[in-house]
């Protein structure tokens, strides 16, 4: 999900949308490592202070590191401090004041239930195209529905390391199982995996991801277009 969120942010920035990327995966985190900007100066989530649940948007935006034109608020999981839900909401609202789009990597998605602005945002599920992956996606979609979220956009991701001809479910089968449109597939990239493992970060929207990410970016633009010029944000 973190790679997909990052590529979506990159694509929207290339389309001249101001974009912020928030790492709200408080179990794994390390979005700055994934992007190869861990040594860059900038605010981390463990340093966010939201007195009375409010943060000044311009000031916060200015303190963030920048990656490919995208403002990034990473989480450092080695810090003992995990942000409270109101701090997450305050960060989202602050960055929504100064960016066209705010993308939140919510990890496994449990945080969505407790943060009102996450429940009210556009939801995206990265579903592994395997029997197990689709079952998990279906379960998560049910959770989103129980929390009052809108129907999510679903992106199918081919499983890594599966034996040739085994363990992989096609887009058509995935759509039948989920009774929903599934974008993709996003194909694994050996070069991207190598770059991330070597600390070089994401250096492009990979060929195997380009079509799905572009279609997802189109959907985000459709979501913000009705109030173009106002302050509607994608979260």
Question: Where are the regions that the model predicts?
Answer:
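Cytosolic-facing regulatory segments adjacent to core modules
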Residues: 56-67, 71-111
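Glycine-rich phosphate-binding P-loop
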Residues: 1-6, 23
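Inter-motif core of Ras-like GTPase G domains
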Residues: 97, 110-131
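Phosphate-binding loop that captures ATP/GTP phosphates
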Residues: 12-71
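Beta-strand-loop-alpha "switch" segments that mediate conformational coupling across diverse proteins
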Residues: 158-161, 171-205
């Amino acid at each position: 999900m973190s790679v997909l969120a990052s590529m979506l942010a990159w694509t929207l920035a290339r389309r001249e949308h101001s974009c912020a990327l928030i790492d709200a995966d408080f179990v794994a985190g390390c979005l700055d490592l994934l992007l190869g900007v861990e040594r860059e100066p900038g605010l981390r989530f463990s340093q966010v202070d939201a007195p009375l649940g409010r943060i000044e948007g311009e000031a916060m935006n200015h303190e963030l590191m920048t990656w490919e034109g995208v403002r990034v608020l990473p989480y450092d999981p080695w810090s003992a401090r995990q942000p409270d839900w109101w701090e997450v909401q305050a960060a989202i609202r602050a960055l929504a004041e100064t960016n066209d789009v705010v993308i939140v990597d919510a990890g496994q998605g449990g945080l969505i239930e407790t943060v009102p602005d996450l429940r009210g945002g556009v939801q995206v599920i990265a579903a592994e195209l395997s029997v197990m992956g689709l079952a998990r996606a279906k379960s998560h979609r049910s959770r989103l529905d129980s929390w009052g979220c809108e129907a999510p956009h679903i992106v199918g991701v081919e499983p890594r390391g599966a034996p040739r001809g085994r363990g992989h479910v096609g887009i058509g089968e995935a759509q039948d199982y989920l009774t929903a449109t599934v974008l993709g597939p996003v194909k694994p990239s050996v070069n991207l995996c190598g770059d991330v493992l070597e600390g070089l970060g994401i250096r492009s929207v990979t060929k195997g991801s380009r079509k799905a990410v572009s279609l997802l970016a189109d959907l985000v633009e459709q979501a913000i277009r009705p109030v173009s010029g106002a302050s509607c944000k994608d979260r």
